[in-house]
């Protein structure tokens, strides 16, 4: 790994630091924000508004992923992640100065439009710049830095949420200035000088020729996004004897610890195994355990529960992303990887709407999520055992 490659990896990691940071800022500050900035005080109303805004943010990710995925294949990966972080920074800073909830929703949509491509385009750049075993550690580092972004946001929870938003926006502007000097991917440079450029970023070309890996990789992401959508509702039912906001922060520290462990394990796994199947199977087992044991969790064991849920976090995302990116040609690689991640994230809209309708009755909620978790696990396990991956990007 040369000096320039290390610099590229560092700047990519800092971008995902901000991505994870912002996701966590909303998680740790939304109670205070809704009360102070918009006058929403009822705990159930706060939870429903959180689901609503989360759905809007996920909508921004879906639109942004498709838009910036196409642009990254047409005009370059570096160009896209440079200006998308600028959009995020400006709208995030503006968001703390509005008192109208609908204007706030619009700004959050634009913020997540800007963040949409961070993980997927960074993944594409890593697999295009580095050989597989080094890329595996690069992906682990990317996600671990993202997790530290989440930890930073949780620690910043002692400050005003406005300070947290300003920090995210200003940090994004700093990253924007660093990204001006990054070199473009050699695979994109080759594409740019070839006749294949006319197909670059084509949704029609992607769906017509690569719909199978697109669909199956999306379905594989579902367990992770199911968990990160439902986990705060689970904490709500555990928080009877402790302040909800405090319990969320304790839970998140456990979740982040589990994420880091998972990232490190995935890095070692990729040094010795050429297929992600075993890793996925183990994670699906952990997924089912995490859903079924929550009814036995108390405030005293919430940190450990966070660690368990976190184990299906970083490594699971790293694994599917690294392998999925190699299944598409350069002209649609960014679009495909962005779309898979965005569809996974925006599945949170579906889950969020359902969970919001169940949340008033814990018994019904518990039964329904157990049934849904089993169905998801069965679907993903069938895919894992039956899907034969065909790698297009092959590197030694």
Residue ranges and their predicted role:
Residues 27-63:
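Extracellular/periplasmic helix-loop-helix junction of adjacent transmembrane segments
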Residues 134-158, 171, 340-352:
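Glycine-rich segments within core transmembrane alpha-helices of 12-TM secondary carriers
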Residues 7-40, 231-236, 351:
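Extracytoplasmic
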Residues 107-144:
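Cytoplasmic helix-loop-helix junction between adjacent transmembrane helices
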Residues 74-85, 271-284:
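Cytoplasmic membrane-interface "Motif A"-like loop-to-helix N-cap segments
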Residues 76, 97-102, 131, 296-297:
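Helix-breaking motifs and short loop linkers at transmembrane-helix boundaries and internal kinks
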Residues 27-28, 210-263:
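Extracytoplasmic gate region of multi-pass secondary transporters
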Residues 65-76, 263-274:
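Helix-to-loop junctions at the C-terminal end of transmembrane segments
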């Amino acid at each position: 790994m040369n000096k320039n490659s290390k610099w590229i990896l560092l700047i990519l990691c800092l971008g995902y630091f901000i991505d994870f940071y912002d996701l966590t800022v909303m998680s740790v500050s939304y109670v205070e924000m809704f009360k102070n900035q918009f006058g929403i005080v009822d705990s159930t109303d706060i939870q429903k508004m959180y689901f609503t805004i989360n759905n809007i943010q996920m909508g921004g990710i879906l639109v942004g992923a498709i838009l910036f995925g196409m642009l990254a294949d047409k005009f370059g990966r570096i160009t896209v992640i440079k200006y998308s972080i600028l959009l995020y920074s400006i709208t995030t800073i503006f968001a703390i100065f509005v008192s109208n909830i609908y204007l706030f929703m619009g700004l959050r949509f634009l913020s997540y439009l800007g963040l949409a491509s961070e993980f997927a385009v960074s993944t594409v750049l890593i697999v295009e710049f580095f050989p597989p075993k080094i890329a595996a550690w690069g992906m682990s580092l990317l996600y671990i830095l993202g997790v530290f972004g989440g930890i930073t946001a949780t620690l910043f929870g002692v400050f005003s949420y406005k300070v947290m938003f300003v920090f995210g926006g200003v940090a994004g502007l700093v990253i924007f200035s660093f990204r001006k000097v990054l070199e473009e991917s050699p695979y994109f440079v080759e594409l740019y000088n070839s006749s294949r450029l006319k197909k670059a970023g084509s949704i029609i070309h992607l769906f017509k020729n690569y719909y199978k890996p697109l669909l199956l990789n999306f379905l594989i992401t579902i367990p992770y996004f199911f968990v990160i959508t439902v986990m705060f509702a689970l904490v709500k039912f555990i928080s009877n004897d402790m302040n909800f906001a405090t319990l969320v922060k304790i839970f998140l520290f456990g979740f982040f610890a589990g994420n880091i462990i998972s990232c490190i394990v995935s890095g070692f796994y990729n040094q010795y195994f050429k297929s992600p199947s075993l890793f996925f199977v183990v994670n699906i087992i952990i997924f089912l355990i995490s859903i079924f044991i929550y009814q036995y969790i108390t405030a005293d064991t919430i940190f450990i529960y966070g660690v368990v849920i976190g184990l299906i976090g970083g490594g699971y995302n790293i694994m599917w992303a690294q392998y999925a990116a190699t299944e598409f040609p350069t002209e649609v690689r960014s679009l495909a990887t962005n779309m898979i991640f965005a569809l996974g994230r925006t599945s949170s809209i579906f889950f969020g709407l359902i969970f919001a309708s169940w949340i008033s009755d814990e018994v019904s909620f518990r039964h329904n999520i157990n049934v849904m978790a089993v169905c998801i696990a069965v679907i993903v396990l069938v895919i894992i055992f039956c899907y034969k991956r065909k790698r297009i990007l092959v590197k030694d």
